[in-house]
A protein has these predicted regions:
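Glycine-rich loop(s) and the adjacent beta-strand/alpha-helix scaffold that form part
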Residues: 7-70, 271-276
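Fold-independent oxyanion-binding glycine-rich loops
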Residues: 10-11, 15-18, 53, 93-94, ...
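Short beta-alpha connecting loops at secondary-structure transitions
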Residues: 31-35, 72-78, 151-157, 262-271
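Short Gly/Pro-enriched turn/cap motifs at secondary-structure boundaries
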Residues: 37-40, 77-82, 113-114, 219-223, ...
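An anion/pyrophosphate-binding glycine-rich loop and adjacent beta-alpha core
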Residues: 47-49, 56-175
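A glycine-rich dinucleotide-binding beta-alpha-beta segment and adjacent secondary-structure elements
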Residues: 181-264
Length: 276
């Protein structure tokens, strides 16, 4: 009913999760454009409480982010995925490639989207890259390209999240990419396919983009776990800006911040909020 209650205790354990449910904090610390798999309740309240107690926050710009999220609605926690098409190119808003798409691990993928202007990457491919008997995506319960690709793409095109064109130049114009740069990027990729000298060293799934129709899908990063937080002792006691223990205050779970204790490694027990 909104009544405030004061609870007195010898100690308090703050285990309020991360801030992946707060678009404001994700924009502040991580990305200009971002989606999230975090529950709506994980809004970073615990960080504000600890800052009020004098605990500085560190590594807040670290998070477990993945590539290829499609913003299908106004809710940044409701989205689709797209980056697994056979041989597809990752193109930024300047019409340029940024990585070896088939040789990228999760860290390279997240860095690619993080470094792209406005965190926007277009997944670009041609009809030649579609394998009829393959899944639309590499994971999940999707059917085959033959069954589900066309209706799914049509739904994205209607929402202004994907484009289809008969030529590379036409695709660039529809998406709003610099035509000369984009066509040169595709030409360089096709030359690499023909001569075995891909500009980014790619040697797998080298399928030339020679014949249309051509497609582009707008994608942004999506976050699963945020990895920053206050510093603490080995006993999970929170430290102030002088490195001294704030008496009676402990932290546990995602608010600890994986980056503070494990660098780029994922640590079990710090991402259980996504199970809610």
């Amino acid at each position: 009913d909104g009544t405030e209650t004061t609870l007195l205790a010898p100690a308090t354990v703050v285990c309020t999760g991360g801030y992946g449910g707060s678009e404001e904090l994700l924009n502040k610390y991580n990305f200009e454009n971002v989606l999230s798999t975090s529950p709506a309740c994980v809004t970073g309240d615990g960080y504000a409480w600890l800052e009020e107690l004098g605990a500085p926050l560190t590594n807040m710009d670290f998070c477990t982010a993945y590539a290829g999220g499609i913003p299908t609605s106004d809710d940044f926690r409701s989205f689709g995925y797209f980056n697994a098409t056979n041989g597809a190119l990752w193109i930024n808003t300047n019409g340029e490639r940024m990585a070896n798409e088939t040789g990228a691990d999760s860290h390279v993928k997240s860095e690619t989207w993080a470094n792209a202007p406005h965190n926007i990457v277009y997944t670009v491919f041609s009809s030649e890259m579609l394998i009829p008997d393959a899944k639309v995506f590499s994971t999940g319960a999707w059917g085959s390209v033959k069954e589900e690709f066309d209706p799914y793409m049509e739904s994205l095109i209607e929402k202004g999240l994907a484009w289809k064109a008969d030529t590379v130049e036409e695709l660039a114009k529809k998406v709003g990419l610099p035509v000369d740069t984009f066509t040169a990027t595709i030409a360089a990729y096709n030359d690499g396919c023909a001569n075995g000298n891909d500009p980014f060293g790619r040697t797998a799934q080298e399928v030339a983009m020679a014949n249309g129709p051509f497609y582009a899908v707008k994608t942004v990063p999506y976050v699963m776990i945020t990895c920053g937080g206050p510093m603490m002792t080995k006993d999970c006691e929170v430290l102030n800006s002088d490195g001294l223990v704030i008496e009676g205050v402990y932290i546990a779970g995602e608010i600890v911040g994986m980056a503070n204790v494990g660098g780029l490694n994922s640590i079990g027990g710090m991402g259980h909020g996504n199970c809610l």
